[in-house]
Amino acid sequence: MNLKVIEKLTSEKFWRAKSKLNRTKIQRIFDNYSKKIDKSSFSTSFLNGKFVSVNFYVRDEVLDSYVELKFRFSPLNPRESLNFSTEVDSLPEIRILYKEITYRSYETYNKALKKDINNTIKELKSRLAQLEEML
């Protein structure tokens, strides 16, 4: 799993640099980034007719889990009906779903991920010690 790409996609700086975003441009951005990460996919939709919604999924084979990044883009003009060319706010609401827990920032997600990695390492070391005893 490429954490640098996930960090970039969830950074405010990355999205602030984008201008004149609409669903078509958003799809292009996520299409490019899904090509950079193995085992990833995404879907876009008009959520309740009020938001452009993107769900970006990344499979982590090492930890045998999924990370889901959820993005909601609000239209610049809330009265305008959404279509593929409706301009949206470049700063989305972002949520990261990992092991059934929702994180609102990359930093809190990364802490949970590191804790999970450390626990996996401890478990593997314990198994290795048990296997060595069997020799």
Residue ranges and their predicted role:
Residues 1-9:
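N-terminal, Lys/Arg- and Ser/Thr-rich interaction peptides
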Residues 9-13, 18-26, 30-37, 79-81, ...:
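Ampiphathic alpha-helical segments that act as solvent-exposed interaction surfaces
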